[in-house]
């Protein structure tokens, strides 16, 4: 089964709004075994939109539109589809009543302009919208299916999961399903990951996809099969081989939030942590405290850019700074032990490095970072050489720091 996605809205064409709906729908449809052959974006132009819908219905079995369901005159998606199908627009009384109730719950009388949101092409099956005011619709016509979604991603996703996905699962002949696992790596460049994984040979199905982002590389493991269980097995098998080669760089899998994973481990083990940061300037502390309830295990942090602060607050000996410099294993270790001593936390995490673009030398290049972790029993330190510009180095340092803490906690009894 093939599908086409038509995203509407001049704000998308002008770049004012990021089109996350197409990404979401493409991924979800592929997982159902539905091939998306084309995704286009059109503005609020009747003639262009009408042409796009007509051509899509000639090409594919499933046409999905997003956006253009609002109450204003430039919201024309349903009217265009009605014209293409040659059917009138009709008001759905139940949708209208639900919309009036939506406004009533907020103590507002529904403006008349919203009435048009309850009008649909004749023959539509209404898709309720419990997250907003604009319902969607599903139309079956001559062996084709048209699904009409509102534009806000929060509304679209809820409607897809609740109503459209179950409908699509009942359609026979959807083809092979796609199963995916995303490994998120840090501390290594995209080309270096590809070089390491060359020994796996030429992969077709399952396959690997690469996406470089600031401070991390997303490695996508994909597999297609008619049987979902077989696709899962193929993904698991290749994932195991991949992690055997680059597992030391993996800091998260799929939608895992590493700071939450680390926080859960700290809570489970009854431990606390504090942070001393130089080149990341509070970014690690911010990630820890992005998690609600992190005060149960995160004590606090110190941003110590200046060497005087490293000495006076963290207790880094002057002789260490003079002999080895601020960016060194010795300084990182002293910072980690110092923040642990200062705050009374069980673990002390410290970061010092050269984020660039200036400050690097042949001996200490831009991207050189030391991450130290101190506990009552030992102090560990890792030397990192991170690729990219300043932003990438700092994000990579944060991700690597969380990976180091996670690895340490997983080794503890």
From Swiss-Prot:
User: What are the transmembrane regions?
Assistant: none
Gene3D superfamilies (alphabetical): 3.30.70.2860, CinA-like, MoaB/Mog-like domain
**InterPro entries found in the cross-reference section:** CinA, CinA-like_C, CinA_C, CinA_KH, Competence-induced_CinA, MoaB/Mog-like_dom_sf, MoaB/Mog_dom
A Pfam family annotated for this chain is: CinA
Which protein family is it in?
Belongs to the CinA family.
Annotated protein name in UniProt: Putative competence-damage inducible protein
């Amino acid at each position: 089964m093939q599908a086409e996605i038509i995203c509407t809205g001049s704000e998308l064409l002008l770049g004012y709004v990021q089109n996350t709906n197409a990404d979401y729908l493409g991924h979800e449809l592929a997982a159902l075994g539905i091939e998306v052959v084309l995704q286009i974006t059109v503005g609020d132009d009747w003639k262009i939109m009408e042409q796009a819908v007509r051509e899509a219905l000639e090409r594919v079995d499933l046409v999905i539109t997003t956006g253009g369901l609002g109450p204003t005159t430039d919201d024309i998606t349903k009217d265009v589809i009605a014209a293409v199908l040659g059917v009138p627009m009709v008001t759905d009384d139940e949708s209208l009543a639900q919309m009036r109730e939506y406004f009533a719950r907020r103590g507002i009388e529904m403006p008349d302009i919203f009435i048009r949101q309850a009008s649909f092409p004749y023959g539509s099956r209404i898709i309720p919208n419990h997250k907003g005011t604009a319902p969607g619709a599903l139309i079956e016509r001559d062996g084709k299916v048209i699904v009409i979604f509102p534009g806000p991603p929060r509304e679209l996703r809820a409607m897809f999961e609740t109503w459209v996905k179950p409908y699509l699962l009942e359609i026979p002949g959807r083809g092979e399903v796609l199963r995916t696992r995303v490994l998120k790596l840090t501390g290594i460049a995209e080309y270096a990951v590809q070089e390491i994984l060359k020994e796996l040979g030429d992969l077709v199905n399952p396959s690997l996809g690469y996406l470089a982002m600031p401070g991390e590389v997303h490695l996508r493991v994909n597999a297609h099969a008619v049987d979902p269980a077989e696709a899962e097995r193929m993904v698991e098998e290749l994932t195991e081989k991949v992690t055997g080669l680059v597992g030391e760089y993996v800091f998260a899998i799929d939608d895992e939030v590493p700071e939450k994973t680390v926080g859960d481990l700290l809570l489970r083990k009854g431990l606390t942590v504090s942070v001393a940061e130089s080149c990341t300037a509070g970014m690690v502390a911010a990630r820890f405290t992005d998690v609600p309830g992190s005060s149960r295990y995160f004590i606090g942090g110190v941003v110590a850019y200046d060497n005087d602060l490293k000495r006076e607050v963290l207790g880094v000996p002057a002789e260490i700074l003079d002999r080895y410099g601020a960016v060194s294993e010795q300084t990182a270790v002293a910072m980690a032990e110092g923040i642990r001593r200062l705050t009374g936390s069980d673990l002390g995490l410290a970061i010092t490095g050269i984020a660039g673009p200036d400050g690097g030398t042949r001996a200490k290049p831009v991207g050189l970072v030391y991450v130290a972790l101190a506990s009552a029993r030992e102090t560990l330190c890792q030397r990192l050489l991170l690729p990219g510009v300043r932003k990438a180095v700092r994000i990579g340092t944060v991700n690597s720091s969380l990976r180091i803490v996670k690895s340490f906690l997983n080794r503890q009894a």
